[in-house]
Amino acid sequence: MAIASPTFFSATKTDHIDGLISGAYWQLGPDRTISWGLGDFGYTWTTTGLQVMQEAFNAWEAVIDVDFEYIGYVDDYRKSTEVFIQPIDIMLSLHDNTFFNSSSIVGRGLFPNTEFADRIVASEGNNTISYPQPEGDITFNIEHPVFDMSNLGSNAFHIVLHEIGHALGLKHPHDGGLAGYTTYQDAGLSNLDDGFLTLMSYDPTSSIWEYGWASTPLPLDIIAAQTIYGANTTTHAGNTTHSLLDDGLLRTVYDVSGTDTLDASNIDKGITLRLAQGNSTTVDTLSTVYIAVNTVIENAIGTFFNDTIYGEKGDNTLQG
């Protein structure tokens, strides 16, 4: 069980990190566990919905030192404390336009901060008796047209990852969060307020989105979340080959150790591969792969066409 911290996470004085930190965070026990579950409020979760949520939590767990544990399902999303021995930390529920008082809102993730969460749910007619632990809870608008949970590479999945980011304490780069930390704009980092670099950005809007939708946390999200919770030190340990896919998705390769390879041999056209951490390789206008900061990919295998391959600063084997 995690506890919503009563104090704020300290600013790092590094603007591209503080620009994504709200100040709210979970205090973790020795097992590093944050529990999650599904709750009903007139709309029932499907098996596919559960699978999609599991994939989203798995994507976050792969990059931070947190064990996300699925606890179960409750009939009323506000009542996990009455059903289970321990309350569920992050409860996910489905609502509609009436609940949100809007047809344009897709979802909402509450920061893990008691004062903030209680204030939000009070504005919706709840109180600490009817809804005793709202911190970190996430609600989705089932009536919004983009919220299709059948596709892991959809706008909806991108939004699920975004809302989990809020539940972990990440904020939008254009606002100050709870602690009033810097925005990217105030820090002179407006160029980083981009959905290509962080799930938490609103720019560009979905109506003019030109990238693939994210299937993992993005580079700046990983840096910020690892600052709060630490890094996962087991993901892709050992020698790993990461195959590039022309599947229309935006993803980050996070790899902790070994001698690793970026393999583009199944791509049917020449491309430019970049192995250095923080760099990206674009397969087409939608499919893009970032190399996470502190991830070292030593080797590359190109396509059967004309490629340009940039290595990283260590010893590389580059096969064209």
Regions flagged by a language model, labelled:
Residues 1-47, 102-123, 128:
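Disordered inhibitory propeptide/activation segment of secreted metzincin zinc metalloprotease zymogens
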Residues 42-50, 141-160:
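Short pre-active-site segment immediately N-terminal to the catalytic Zn-binding motif
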Residues 44-75, 161, 257:
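Zn2+-dependent metallopeptidase catalytic core
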Residues 82-88, 94-101, 106-111, 154-217:
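The catalytic-center signature of Zn2+-dependent metalloproteases
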Residues 85, 257, 266-268, 277, ...:
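Extracellular, beta-strand-rich repeat scaffolds characterized by small/acidic residue-biased motifs
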Residues 233, 272-299:
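Acidic/polar low-complexity surface segments
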Residues 263, 292, 299-301, 308-310, ...:
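Short beta-strand elements of solenoid repeat domains
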